[in-house]
A protein has these predicted regions:
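Conserved C-terminal beta-signal and adjacent last beta-strands/turns
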Residues: 50, 56, 72-171
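Gram-negative outer-membrane beta-barrel transporters
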Residues: 3-107
Length: 171
């Protein structure tokens, strides 16, 4: 037999698909700067209306050239916003809630895939009906009313619409 050539063995293994992939998670000695904050406001308005909004900011910086093999996996959009308007008693026993969520594009890094997650705006809504005789509330609603499928990470499937009905007894 003679000496083995690890380089040739590696090339042969890659060419034939005879490999097992794995991810080794490590830290890094390079300087990493991160900053984040969130702020939310809510205001009751006349006639039982309420508006609310929140904003989240997340920033993560480091010099990739100082450690090219380091994969941060921060996986968070820099900007996220949510706003809603609601009224739990718009008229006798009826209420509603409509909200909009937005996030900008961001880089997704993981052991199985790296790539950009697109900017997305999603609108959700629900109506509610109070049933005083049963001390209950019936809610009917939907998420992602626009119907455009979107993703929040790489790997799993796309997120579509979801419809729901709930009955809360003795709220």
């Amino acid at each position: 037999l003679g000496p083995t050539n690890p380089g040739a063995q590696s090339v042969d293994a890659l060419a034939s698909g005879n490999v097992r992939a794995f991810q080794l998670y490590t830290n890094t000695d390079i300087e990493i700067k991160s900053l984040g904050f969130g702020v939310g406001l809510s205001k009751k308005l006349p006639s039982n209306f309420e508006v609310s909004a929140n904003y989240n900011y997340a920033q993560f910086d480091f010099d990739q050239s100082k450690d090219p093999s380091f994969e941060a996996g921060f996986n968070t959009p820099k900007h996220r916003v949510k706003a809603s308007i609601s009224n739990d008693n718009l008229f006798k026993n009826f209420g509603f809630n409509v909200s909009a969520r937005w996030s900008d594009e961001y880089m997704w890094e993981s052991s199985f895939a790296d790539g950009m997650i697109d900017e997305v705006t999603v609108i959700d809504a629900q109506i509610s009906y109070g049933i005083p005789s049963l001390k209950s509330i019936l809610k009917v609603g939907a998420t992602n009313l626009g119907g455009t499928e979107y993703r929040q990470l790489l790997g799993p499937g796309l997120i579509g619409q979801q419809y729901f009905v709930s009955l809360t007894i003795n709220p």
